[in-house]
């Protein structure tokens, strides 16, 4: 088929354009008559585009109608095939689109082809990934669209950063129309704003919409009315589907990108809110905004030199100077690093991208004139009479790093909490000390006057602002990070000391690894945030990453002392971590000589620690087959084995990592082996051996002032380990937050914190006599890395929960308990790693006396757990305590409704992952407060926002070992569950035979001959050899026990057991819809139990809370309950935040201004749909549901 030439040069003007249409309409394929003069010759940039459409195989071309649209067009030349039509599209600046028959208009995009429906009527086009670079150039338009009675109400508010493709001034106006539309009578437009790239329109328009217009689109275009030409130029456009605008819940309001012609006619794109967030940092604010006290404008003329202008740029909107060549033209002209470019040759460029500005600068032949904005350091009086100097620049590494793609933790209009602040402070006191903001990654000192070294760091006094951590003194001698290289492959940036540089400086080629650890409200956090591990001396080859990483420890991760010379970084490898069966995540594994750190590199050079460290002495390695790239790391968590599945990228990497891990695991387990003479100190409670602590306190540190709060522990250096005491067979000290358990000596030993004269070198530190009964001693569950002040007496430490700021729920202090309830054998704690000599050199204060060892009381089990007390009280005491624990938990906010029973700490031990015990308060047998340990599922993984407000201790969902455990030789036993525990758990899990057999037989690996019962009756039955009688007696708890009139009323577990268990036919009906499942009481309980195992129960809890909210009648109660639901489930970083989009969150927030019963309807509908698509199908495939529908007819109760 012959092809008609599609590119002719034409003169601008309406009459010539009409003449083109006439000529082309009368010209056929075979016509060889010459074209007019204005249609021949070389084309100029002003030429038009003619779209020629011919039918395949047709001899004559179809007639063309009048011209419909003119505007700028991207240069393209491509033949597209749609159905039987061949389309040749060529453009060189302006577009002339011609229809082939009335009512059909084809605006074909070169990269979008719609197979059956034209793109005018395509209401839901196929999704296409749009990068931010494609939509950043033309500018943005702010508008709002509302619909009332089939009338569209448009409010064109303002524009921003409008950039026209034509040179000269920009005179913008906005044009609105419905497409496709033949009549021009319905086109509306705003007034023209002369010479303004940020125009303010504030005009309203009304568009009545008929039923036949539902398939059309509302087109909003922004034009530039050029003064030197009659033809306007298109700046950008966007379009909205009319049918979607008429829906009641559709809301169009805010900033939208101006897209290109092809893209804008089919879709619209809203500017993300994170890109509109007001920038708090003075450096990141839009320059030139009248903030003259923080900066100034400078006009700099830079001539082109031999090698260019002599500077590099970075960042987008605005562009900043990244580096200035020493001695180059830019430096001689006065340009400095981090200057913000406002204008280039008197042309505004603050909204330009870096690539565009670089291309424009390169095209300048002789010189450039820059208008730049330069930050002026702001000096303010700081705490303690020092000088507070806000950082006037980012580090070079920050500028090279790309911006965050997703900022989930941004708070809009809400003051951030101290642990969420992103402030960056440099505080210099009289001793030239440095303090660093709590969450800032790191701050580097800019190059000033040839200074390449850091000022001398010293121990500064704690500021009043809690959002500070103090940099510990640095020893620049032997703690430099030197990656492992082979002798012949040492790169230039390796930082070799042989070059004679001072490596305390922050030059371009020497970056230090720094560890930022959060404050959580403590002003004297002394745990050395600048980490410089010493050089490794391993033989595992070249596999330490070349660039140092910034390790960030979140609030839920146990901080580490990586400065310890006994700890060596062996390797750093990028591996795949399998979180589920098919879900894998890219992680960076840091293997030290004694532990493993799993991190995720969200940004280049920045690694967020995902979980608490795994100590090598408590892990095992399974390499698997040699052909498979996967290998497993097993670890102990509450006497159950858990594992991580890792996958290497190559066989060499797997062999390297496995070799390193297996060798060092063997070393650490050999070092952690208990000495033979320590066996004499082991008790019968060997199955409850406490976790050993790596992070202790070393001797020789001075006392903390009485006004300071607790400081976290640091790593115990070699040579300062205390001798093993009788409760720590492995020679390790217990964690301050891990209260070890014991069940043997509960009736014979008591204890309280020792006096200051307790010597730290004893195996068993002496304990004072217990205080009087009316005095209280704190028994608080502290987070990891914190401890009470050792030098305070009980009266002072009694007020510790009131002054401590921590996300952990502060428990009230417990009273002095009788020996049958609590016993407190002493635990010696090591002291700070810094010697008094270092403190003397740092602060200038005289050395203080060595701090006496602080004895941490060991939390024993109360009468509910004690074997002897259990023998005296029996089953009734267990049930009474269980019901009291439920009543306490029901009254607490933020707690889950159903917790595991506290009367049995050995319930349900399996080989899958379990979570650590928590300490809770409850009523003791004699009315006093007591401590009880429950093994409930407390940790959450649904969002990172919830981890910051978790009411429990600092923990992570995948974390099951807060500290290193004792060794592998710990004997483990399985005990028969108590009746109340059995009833509660069987009622929760549906009473399947699998759970029933698991309760009475236990795990094969855990069961043994010396199982410990709950009471004397259970012990007697266990000794008997008649298994049938044993089972009959145990199953007797399912009878209605009306024979005990003095027994307490039945709790929630009894009510659940009395509920009707559905048949398999009823359970099958649950698979028809989620509504039928939630209506059934038993189905709701089973579904909630399933979601708890999936760590997504917050969705159902939110849905149930909304259902309860609709039943509230009082308006005052409704308002308070609505705020509580929003703060707990919907607010950003809520403790149980559900997965909602930003529109639903903002819509619900607006509804709270006037609270009604339906203010949560949209959010509840979204969560219901999420459960219906995600959780509900998984529940139908779960073993729990399959057991219910496949259950056999059970025998009647005995």
UniProtKB/Swiss-Prot annotation:
Identification of the protein by name: Regulator of G-protein signaling 3
PDZ domain span: 299-376
Primary location class: cytoplasm
GO MF term (any one): GTPase activity
TM annotation in the entry: none
Subunit-structure text: Binds EFNB1 and EFNB2. Binds the GNB1-GNG2 heterodimer.
Localization per record: Cytoplasm; Nucleus; Cell membrane
PTM notes: Phosphorylated by cyclic GMP-dependent protein kinase. ISGylated.
Polar residues bias (residue ranges): 739-751
Region described as Disordered: 669-933, 1007-1026, 1032-1056
Biased composition (Pro residues): 753-773
Residues of the RGS domain: 1073-1198
Omega-N-methylarginine: residues bearing it: 448
Topology in membrane: Peripheral membrane protein
UniProtKB keywords: Cell membrane, Cytoplasm, Membrane, Methylation, Nucleus, Phosphoprotein, Signal transduction inhibitor, Ubl conjugation
Bias kind Acidic residues: ranges: 877-906
Species, as recorded: Homo sapiens (Human)
Encoding gene (name): RGS3
Residues where Phosphoserine is found: 674, 943, 946, 978, 1007
Functional description taken from the UniProt entry: Down-regulates signaling from heterotrimeric G-proteins by increasing the GTPase activity of the alpha subunits, thereby driving them into their inactive GDP-bound form. Down-regulates G-protein-mediated release of inositol phosphates and activation of MAP kinases.
Residues of the C2 domain: 137-256
One cellular component term from this protein's GO annotations in UniProt: cytosol
Compositional bias of kind Basic and acidic residues: 679-697, 907-917
A biological process term (GO) from this entry: G protein-coupled receptor signaling pathway
């Amino acid at each position: 088929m012959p092809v008609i030439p599609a590119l002719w040069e034409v003169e601008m003007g309406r009459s010539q354009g009409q003449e083109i249409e006439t000529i082309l309409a009368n010209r056929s394929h075979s016509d060889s008559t010459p074209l007019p003069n204005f249609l021949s010759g070389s084309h100029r940039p002003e030429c038009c585009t003619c779209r020629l459409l011919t039918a395949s195989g047709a001899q004559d071309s179809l007639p063309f109608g009048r011209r419909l649209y003119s505007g700028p067009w991207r240069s393209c030349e491509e033949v597209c095939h749609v159905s039987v039509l061949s389309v040749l599209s060529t453009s060189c600046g302006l577009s002339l689109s011609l229809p082939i028959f009335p009512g059909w208009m084809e605006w074909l995009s070169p990269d979008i082809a719609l197979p059956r429906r034209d793109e005018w009527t395509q209401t839901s086009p196929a999704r296409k990934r749009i990068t931010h670079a494609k939509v950043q150039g033309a500018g943005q338009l702010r508008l709002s669209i509302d619909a009332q009675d089939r009338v569209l109400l448009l409010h064109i508010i303002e524009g921003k950063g409008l950039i026209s493709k034509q040179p000269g001034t920009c005179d913008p106006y906005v044009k609105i129309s419905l497409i496709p539309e033949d009549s021009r009578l319905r086109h509306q437009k705003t007034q023209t704003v002369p010479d303004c790239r940020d125009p303010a329109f504030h005009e309203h328009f009304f568009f009545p919409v008929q039923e036949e217009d539902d398939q059309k689109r509302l087109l909003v275009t922004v034009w530039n009315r050029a003064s030197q030409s009659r033809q306007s130029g298109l700046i950008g456009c966007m379009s909205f589907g009319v049918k979607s605008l008429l829906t009641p819940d559709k809301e169009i309001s805010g900033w939208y990108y101006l897209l290109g012609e092809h893209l804008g006619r089919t879709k619209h794109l809203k500017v993300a809110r994170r890109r509109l967030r007001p920038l708090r940092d003075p450096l990141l604010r839009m320059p030139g905004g009248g903030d003259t006290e923080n900066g100034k404008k400078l006009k700099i003329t830079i001539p082109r030199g031999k090698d260019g202008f002599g500077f590099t740029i970075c960042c987008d909107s605005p562009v900043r100077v990244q580096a200035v060549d020493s001695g180059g033209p830019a430096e001689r002209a006065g340009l400095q690093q981090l200057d913000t470019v406002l204008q280039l040759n008197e042309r505004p460029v603050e909204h330009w991208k870096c690539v565009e500005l670089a291309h424009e600068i390169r095209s300048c032949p002789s010189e450039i004139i820059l208008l730049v904005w330069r930050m002026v350091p702001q000096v303010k009086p700081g705490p303690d009479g020092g000088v507070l100097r806000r950082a006037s620049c980012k580090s070079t590494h920050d500028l090279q790093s790309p911006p965050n793609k997703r900022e989930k933790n941004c708070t809009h209009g809400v003051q951030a909490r101290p642990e969420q602040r992103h402030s960056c402070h440099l505080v210099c006191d009289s001793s030239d000390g440095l303090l660093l903001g709590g969450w800032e990654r790191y701050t580097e000192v800019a190059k000033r006057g040839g200074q390449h070294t850091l000022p001398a760091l010293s121990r500064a006094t704690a500021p009043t602002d809690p959002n500070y951590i103090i940099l510990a003194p640095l020893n620049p001698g032997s703690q430099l990070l030197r990656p492992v290289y082979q002798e012949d492959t040492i790169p230039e940036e390796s930082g070799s000391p042989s070059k004679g540089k001072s490596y305390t400086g922050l030059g371009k080629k020497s970056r230090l690894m720094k560890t930022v650890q959060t404050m959580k409200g403590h002003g004297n956090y002394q745990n050395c945030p600048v980490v410089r591990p010493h050089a490794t001396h391993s033989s595992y080859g070249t596999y330490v990453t070349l660039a140092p990483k910034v390790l960030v420890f979140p609030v839920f991760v146990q901080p580490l002392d990586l400065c310890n010379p006994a700890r060596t970084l062996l390797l750093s490898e990028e591996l795949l971590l399998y979180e589920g069966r098919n879900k894998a995540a890219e992680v960076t594994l840091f293997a030290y000589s004694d532990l493993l750190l799993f991190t995720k590199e969200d940004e280049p050079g920045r690694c967020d620690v995902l979980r608490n460290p795994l100590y090598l002495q408590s892990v095992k390695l399974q390499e698997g087959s040699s052909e498979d790239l996967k290998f497993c790391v097993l670890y102990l968590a509450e006497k159950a084995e858990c594992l991580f599945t890792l996958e290497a990228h190559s066989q060499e990497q797997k062999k390297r990592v496995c070799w390193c891990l297996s060798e060092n695991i063997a070393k650490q387990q050999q070092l952690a082996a208990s000495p033979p003479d320590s066996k004499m100190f082991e008790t019968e409670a060997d199955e409850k051996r406490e976790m050993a602590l790596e992070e202790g306190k070393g001797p020789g540190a001075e006392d903390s002032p009485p006004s300071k709060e607790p400081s976290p522990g640091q790593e115990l250096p070699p040579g300062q380990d205390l001798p093993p005491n009788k409760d720590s067979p492995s020679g390790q000290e217990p964690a301050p937050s891990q209260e070890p358990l014991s069940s043997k000596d509960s009736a014979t030993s008591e204890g309280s914190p020792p006096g200051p004269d307790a010597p730290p070198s004893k195996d068993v530190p002496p304990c004072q006599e217990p205080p009087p009964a009316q005095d209280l001693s704190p028994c608080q569950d502290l987070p990891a890395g914190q401890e009470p002040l050792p030098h305070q007496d009980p009266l002072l430490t009694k007020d510790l929960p009131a002054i401590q700021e921590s996300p952990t729920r502060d428990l009230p202090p417990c009273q002095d308990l009788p020996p049958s309830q609590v016993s407190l054998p002493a635990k010696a704690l090591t002291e700070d790693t810094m010697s008094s000599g270092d403190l003397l050199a740092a602060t200038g204060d005289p050395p203080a006396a060595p701090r006496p060892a602080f004895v941490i009381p060991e939390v024993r089990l109360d009468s509910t757990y004690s074997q002897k007390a259990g023998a005296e009280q029996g089953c009734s005491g267990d049930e009474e305590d269980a019901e009291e624990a439920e009543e306490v938990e029901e009254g607490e906010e933020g707690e889950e409704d159903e917790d595991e029973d506290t009367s049995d700490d050995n319930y349900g031990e399996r080989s899958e992952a379990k979570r650590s015990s928590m300490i809770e308060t409850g009523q003791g047998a004699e009315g006093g407060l007591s401590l009880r340990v429950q093994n409930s599922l407390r940790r959450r993984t649904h969002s990172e926002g919830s981890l910051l407000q978790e009411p429990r201790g600092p923990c992570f969902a995948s974390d099951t070992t807060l500290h290193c455990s004792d060794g592998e030789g710990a004997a483990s036993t399985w005990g028969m569950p108590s009746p109340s525990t059995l009833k509660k758990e069987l009622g929760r899990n549906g009473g399947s035979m699998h759970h029933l057999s698991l309760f009475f037989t236990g795990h094969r690996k855990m069961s043994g001959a010396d199982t410990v019962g709950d009471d004397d009756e259970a012990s007697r039955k266990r000794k008997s050899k008649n298994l049938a009688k044993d089972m009959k007696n145990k199953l007797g708890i399912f009878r209605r026990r009306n024979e005990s009139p003095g027994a307490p009323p039945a709790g929630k577990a009894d009510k659940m057991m009395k509920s009707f268990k559905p048949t398999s036919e009823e359970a099958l009906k649950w698979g028809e819809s989620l509504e039928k499942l939630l209506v059934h009481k038993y189905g709701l309980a089973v579904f909630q139990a399933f979601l708890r195992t999936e760590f997504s129960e917050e969705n159902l809890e939110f849905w149930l809370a909304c259902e309860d909210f609709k039943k509230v009648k009082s308006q005052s109660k409704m308002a308070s309950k609505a705020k509580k639901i929003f703060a707990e489930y919907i607010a950003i970083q809520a403790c149980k935040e559900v997965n909602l989009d930003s529109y639903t969150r903002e819509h619900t927030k607006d509804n709270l201004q006037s609270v009604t019963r339906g203010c949560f309807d949209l959010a509840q509908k979204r969560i219901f749909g999420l459960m219906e698509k995600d959780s509900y199908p998984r529940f139908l495939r779960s073993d729990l549901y399959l057991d219910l529908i496949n259950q056999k007819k059970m025998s009647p109760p005995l």
